[in-house]
């Protein structure tokens, strides 16, 4: 496998995302973490902030690049000359949604393959939305996100509570 693309919003990146990035980077020559620009969705972090945070937590992985994209993933794939999409799966509902997306992407470009990677069981409950919710109510996010970005989240949420 040469170049693979791992797309998502990553608002913010979680330890589950990072686990998929680490594992996927071992099975391809280059992994592009593709951060989706969705002007209709107001995220906690801007696209530039998300890209910077992901770069910060993946800097040890020399074959990982972080870029943003808008529009169809298939167009981004063509631009990057990649034929492989990496998707992490936590639950059966993730599979149902991602399976439909994989079929659509393959319909748009039959040369595109989607590789599903099972999330490590210890992260199967984890989502960016749940991280934001826990942080907004003052809960501890230390086990949910990479340590390097905890200050970014606290600053955005404007919450000073420390983990016990």
From Swiss-Prot:
Pathway: Cofactor biosynthesis; coenzyme A biosynthesis; CoA from (R)-pantothenate: step 4/5
Names of required cofactors: Mg(2+)
Keyword set, alphabetical order: ATP-binding, Coenzyme A biosynthesis, Cytoplasm, Magnesium, Nucleotide-binding, Nucleotidyltransferase, Transferase
Domain of life: Bacteria
Sites annotated Transition state stabilizer: 17
An MF annotation (GO) of this entry: pantetheine-phosphate adenylyltransferase activity
Main location as per UniProt: cytoplasm
InterPro entries: Cyt_trans-like, PPAT, Rossmann-like_a/b/a_fold
GO biological-process terms attached to the record: coenzyme A biosynthetic process
Residues involved in substrate binding: 9, 41, 73, 87
Gene Ontology cellular-component annotations: cytoplasm
Subcellular location: Cytoplasm
SUPFAM superfamilies named among the record's database cross-references: Nucleotidylyl transferase (SSF52374)
NCBIfam families membership: coaD_prev_kdtB (TIGR01510), cyt_tran_rel (TIGR00125)
The protein's role, per its UniProt record: Reversibly transfers an adenylyl group from ATP to 4'-phosphopantetheine, yielding dephospho-CoA (dPCoA) and pyrophosphate.
Family to which this protein belongs: Belongs to the bacterial CoaD family.
HAMAP family: PPAT_bact
Name this protein carries in UniProt: Phosphopantetheine adenylyltransferase
């Amino acid at each position: 496998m040469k170049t693979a693309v791992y797309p998502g919003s990553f608002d913010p990146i979680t330890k589950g995302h990072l686990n998929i990035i680490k594992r996927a980077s071992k099975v391809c020559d280059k992994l592009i973490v593709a951060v989706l620009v969705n002007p209709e969705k107001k995220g906690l972090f801007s696209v530039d902030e998300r890209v910077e945070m992901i770069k910060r937590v993946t800097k040890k992985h020399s074959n990982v690049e972080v870029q943003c994209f808008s529009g169809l993933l298939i167009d981004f794939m063509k631009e990057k000359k990649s034929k492989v999409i990496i998707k992490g799966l936590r639950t059966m509902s993730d599979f149902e949604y991602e399976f439909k997306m994989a079929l659509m992407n393959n319909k748009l470009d039959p040369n595109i393959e989607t590789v599903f990677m099972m999330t490590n069981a210890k992260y199967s409950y984890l989502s960016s939305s749940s991280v934001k919710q826990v942080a907004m109510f003052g809960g501890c996010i230390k086990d949910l996100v990479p340590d390097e970005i905890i200050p970014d989240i606290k600053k955005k949420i404007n919450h000073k509570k420390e983990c016990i």
